Amino acid sequence: MRMYDIIQKKRDGKSLSEAEIQWVIEKYVQGEIPDYQVSALCMAIYFQGMTLEETTALTFAVRDSGDRLDFSDIHGLRVDKHSTGGVGDKTSLVVAPIVACMGVKVAKMSGRGLGHTGGTIDKLEAIPGFQTDLPVEKFKKIVNELGIAIVGQNASLAPADKLLYALRDVTATVDSLPLIVSSIMGKKLAADDDCIVLDVKTGSGSFMKTAEKSRELAEWMVEIGKRAGKKMRALITDMDRPLGFAIGNALEVVEAIQTLQGKGPEDLTQLCVALAAHILNLAEKGTYAECEQMAKDAISSGKALQMFADMVEAQGGDKTWILQPEKFPKATYSRSVKAKTSGYIVGVDTESYGVASLLLGAGRNTKEDVIDMTAGIYLCKKTGDFVALGEEIAVLYSSSQKGFDTAEERLLSATKIEKQAPENKPLILDIVE
């Protein structure tokens, strides 16, 4: 085979065969195909698209490009939950312990922050001593004994995805359905879970800005997961507003703990209960209504909070911080952001909120950047709320004052205030099975 012919074929809008797709991924990982040719293929895919068959072949090729985990020695049903990324999305920290309380094994591999969206692993590293990089055998041992562990993605899993993502990131080919699907599902299928529930975000704070695109993404991922023999379900959820009030690593861990205490924000609690209920239902623990009640009971009984604390301890962290969240340090500096006019918050550009937290030090601009764990934003007002002129709408936190002016400017310009109250929009927009 020749890479030139494969690029030309896709450029002309023809379908690639499974053998051609496998060959490209295999040779690229082995270093036998240069970046510039794979860049050209990605751009051809961006413009010409791929069929579901091609995308399935690409996903499986990414999955098979490195090691595949064998969880057969983890006893019982194994589940995973994946979010396509949002702002203030700390659901994994709440959902995983709820599900584990019900005897379903959570062997979860999570990622770091990407662009304006936060990452579960970065959040967990705000807990002193917490180890996100565990040997596979220790990871499996904790899951078998406790029922839950959350670690960072193993570099030997789906190495093709790491190479492709780095390339797509600098060649303006991130926003392509087949490339997004194969990236997410290639990694997910390299792990050995039985059931996967996807939280597909839609709106200004997500990678998919419209409900139609998000639904298409959800349908393709669910179908490809089923083709790989997994039980699948996807929720399409609103990211036209941040989730909860906290944006930033330590701030979000504290809010997740409050949610496990039964004192969390309404939207975050609602979504976490729904995600946990769908996972339990997929794992055949009962009807959806029964599973929803189980999730609520896990919170009200304190069992889910205890499970989270036990997981932190098992992974080397200080569990007293979970049981006494006031131990989390406060940022050195804070600034109050006040409304410049009065009225209702009718909408926000969630991505800009995420970028504002990045400017404060809560995320990375480059791989080498060190995250300020105390940095972030606490929202005092959200979409639908009335604000008076001069009333506090948010508080910015950071270890340095240098990002405050730009972050405040970004936040205010991203907040739309009008005289008329907005219509209420549901948080969960659709379910794909």
Segments predicted by a language model, with ranges:
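Acidic, glycine/proline-rich low-complexity segments that act as flexible tails and inter-domain linkers
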Residues: M1-G88, T259, M307-D318, I428, ...
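A glycine-rich helix N-cap at a beta->alpha junction
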Residues: K123-A149, E219-G225, G229
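Short beta-strand segments
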Residues: M109, V143, V151-N154, I184, ...
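Alpha-helix C-terminal capping segments
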Residues: F47-Q48, L93-A107, K187-D192, R227-A228, ...
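Glycine/serine-rich anion-binding loops at beta->alpha junctions
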Residues: L77-A100, V104-H116
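Self-splicing inteins and homing endonuclease
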Residues: F60-S83, V136-A166
